C-alpha cells in the first residue's frame, strides 16, 4: 500500500543519506572559526570562506526541498503527457538502486497494469555511502527482484514502459550504463519507451550542489549511452531547472 509522504521527507532523506558530508562540513566550520585564534585571517577572506562553506551546506537542502517536497515530483503528474494512452500500458518495469519511493505511486496511476520492480544494486560496483544508507530505509514493493544491470529477466519486446526514476546515475561505469540500457531496449515492446529522470552535471546543479554535482552525469553522456544502446529517440523535458525527464524509444 502506498504510504503518504511526510512533510520535508525529501530534504530529510538528503540529510540522512549524506550525513557524512554534513558532519565533515560542520567540522570544517568549527576548525575555521577556531583557526582565527591561531591565524590572522584577513576578515574579507575569512568571511568569504565561511560563506562558501555555508552555501555548500545549505544550498543542496533548499534545492532538494524544492524538487522533492514542493515541486509535485512524487505526484507523477508529469507522466501524463508522456503516456497519452494509459490503457495501452499493460506492462511496466520500475528499476531502482534499492531505494524505491515510486513503485506504489506508479501502480496507483496505472492500476490495471502489471508492474514489476527491479533493484540493480551491486555492493561491489555501486559503492556510494548514500545509496547504502538509503537501501536500509526503503519501502520495498512486493516481489521486488534483485537483478544484474546487464541481464534483466525480461522477455524480448514485452514491456510497454520502463521507468528509471532518479536511479540510473548510480551506475557509475559508462560501459555498464550502455549494457544496462541495451537490456532496457531489448525488453521494450513495439511502441514502448523508457522514461528516465535525472539531475544532470550542468550549471544549475553545480549552483545547487557545488562539487556534489559530479555525482550526476551530463546530458551528452546520457545521450551517448542511449544511442549506443540502440535507442532512436532521446527527448528531454525540464522538470524544474534541476531535473530532466528523458523520453527514449527504440
Model region roles, listed by residue range:
Residues 87, 111, 172, 189:
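Short conserved AdoMet
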Residues 78, 102-109, 179, 183:
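A short acidic, amphipathic alpha-helical/loop segment
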Residues 91-94, 98-151:
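Class I SAM-dependent methyltransferase SAM/SAH-binding core
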Residues 149-162:
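A short acidic, Gly/Pro-enriched loop at the edge of an enzyme's catalytic core
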Residues 2, 8-27, 33-86:
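Class I SAM-dependent methyltransferase Rossmann-like catalytic core
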Residues 177-193:
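A short glycine-rich, Lys/Arg-flanked "PGG" loop and its adjoining helix->strand segment in the class I
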Residues 160-175:
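A short SAM/SAH-binding and catalytic strip from SAM-dependent methyltransferases
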Residues 193-247:
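C-terminal alpha-helical "lid/dimerization" subdomain adjacent to the S-adenosyl-L-methionine
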Amino acid at each position: 500500500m502506498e504510504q503518504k509522504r511526510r512533510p520535508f521527507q525529501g530534504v530529510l532523506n538528503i540529510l540522512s543519506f549524506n550525513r557524512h558530508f554534513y558532519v565533515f562540513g560542520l567540522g570544517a566550520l568549527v576548525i575555521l572559526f577556531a583557526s582565527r585564534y591561531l591565524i590572522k585571517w584577513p576578515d574579507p577572506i575569512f568571511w568569504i570562506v565561511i560563506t562558501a562553506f555555508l552555501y555548500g551546506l545549505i544550498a543542496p537542502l533548499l534545492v532538494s526541498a524544492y524538487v522533492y517536497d514542493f515541486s509535485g515530483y512524487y505526484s507523477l503528474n508529469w507522466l501524463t503527457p508522456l503516456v497519452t494512452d494509459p490503457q495501452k500500458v499493460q506492462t511496466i518495469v520500475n528499476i531502482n538502486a534499492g531505494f524505491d519511493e515510486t513503485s506504489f505511486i506508479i501502480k496507483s496511476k496505472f492500476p490495471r497494469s502489471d508492474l514489476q520492480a527491479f533493484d540493480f544494486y551491486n555492493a561491489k560496483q555501486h559503492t556510494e555511502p548514500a545509496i547504502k544508507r538509503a537501501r536500509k530505509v526503503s519501502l520495498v514493493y512486493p516481489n521486488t527482484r534483485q537483478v544484474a544491470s546487464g541481464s534483466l529477466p525480461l522477455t524480448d519486446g514485452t514491456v510497454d514502459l520502463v521507468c528509471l526514476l532518479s536511479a540510473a546515475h548510480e551506475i557509475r561505469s559508462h560501459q555498464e550504463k550502455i549494457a544496462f540500457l541495451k537490456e532496457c531496449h531489448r525488453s521494450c515492446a513495439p511502441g514502448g519507451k523508457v522514461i528516465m529522470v535525472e539531475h544532470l552535471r550542468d550549471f544549475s546543479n553545480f549552483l545547487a550542489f557545488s562539487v556534489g554535482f559530479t555525482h550526476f552525469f551530463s546530458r551528452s553522456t546520457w545521450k551517448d549511452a542511449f544511442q549506443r544502446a540502440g535507442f532512436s529517440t532521446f527527448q528531454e523535458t525540464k522538470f524544474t531547472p534541476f531535473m530532466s525527464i528523458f523520453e527514449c524509444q527504440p
